[in-house]
Amino acid sequence: MISSVAPPPEKMLFQLSLRRRGISDRGVLQAMESVPRDRFVDAVHRDSAWRDTALPIACGQTISQPFVVAYMTEQLHLQPGHRVLEIGTGSGYHAAVLSRLVRDVVSVERFKTLADRARARLKELNYANVEVVLGDGFALPEGQGTFDRILVTAAMAELPQPLLDLLDPDGILIAPIGPGNGRQTLIRVQRKDDGFLRKPLVDVRFVPALPGIAREL
């Protein structure tokens, strides 16, 4: 695994910022420190890669603010044997963080350009337990099975039932729910024997999840 090349002061400030904002899970903090965020952004933004801010990537998308990545990851309550589905690969950064904490990650991206770039980047950095799939988050490819955890990284007006059905018993899903052009609520959904238990977490702002596959972008 390639380690970060961030100067030590930047890395220390990065970790301190996460701790000050309430991230306390040691595994999550170690994963956030070990994944080189500067390798997942365009060269023009690399000087800002270790700042706690979202940054633009291709296809009108963004790489999420590090605190949001850490918070969502912490709320998943991950275990080493877990199998995780991510809807919205983007740059591949969040998938890389997840991969340090679980057995396998399947990440679905609707933009071919982003999927191809993320797949190549993750391979180059030796994140071998991440599979990037070009697909539609609203109509997922068949044959992937079910998952211990599901992470949605784009805003949905509501959760599609087929997505919820992919959760294993006691599985957890984290997703931003609300309008694509405003603030959303990050929710935590846990599958129980008698249905799905939903809990609102915090207000967030994500780009909207769009149906279909953008093979030309």
Swiss-Prot record:
One of its GO terms (cellular component) is cytoplasm. The active site is at S64. GO terms for biological process: methylation; protein modification process; protein repair. InterPro entries: PCMT, SAM-dependent_MTases_sf. It is found in: Cytoplasm. Catalyzes the methyl esterification of L-isoaspartyl residues in peptides and proteins that result from spontaneous decomposition of normal L-aspartyl and L-asparaginyl residues. It plays a role in the repair and/or degradation of damaged proteins. This is Protein-L-isoaspartate O-methyltransferase 2.
